[in-house]
Swiss-Prot record:
Venom protein with disintegrin activity. Interacts with both alpha-1/beta-1 (ITGA1/ITGB1) and alpha-v/beta-3 (ITGAV/ITGB3) with a more pronounced effect for alpha-1/beta-1 (ITGA1/ITGB1). Inhibits the cell adhesion of the human glioblastoma cell line U87 and the melanoma cell line IGR39 to fibrinogen and fibronectin. Also inhibits cell adhesion of the rat pheochromocytoma cell line PC12 to type IV collagen. Signal peptide: none annotated. The keyword Disulfide bond applies. GO terms for molecular function: toxin activity. This is RK peptide. Negative results: does not affect the viability of U87, IGR-39 and PC12 cell lines at 100 uM after 24, 48 or 72 hours incubation time. Does not inhibit cell adhesion of the human glioblastoma cell line U87 and the melanoma cell line IGR39 to collagen IV or laminin. In vivo, does not show toxicity on mice by intracerebroventricular injection. It comes from the Eukaryota. It comes from Buthus occitanus tunetanus. The lineage of its organism: Eukaryota, Metazoa, Ecdysozoa, Arthropoda, Chelicerata. It is found in: Secreted. Coiled coil: none annotated. A motif (D/ECD-tripeptide) lies at residues 11-13. Keywords: Cell adhesion impairing toxin, Disulfide bond, Secreted, Toxin. Its main location: secreted.
Amino acid sequence: IDCGTVMIPSECDPKSS
């Protein structure tokens, strides 16, 4: 699954925090 597709992208993308 794509990190941007998940409900919590911030959990997959640390830089998104």
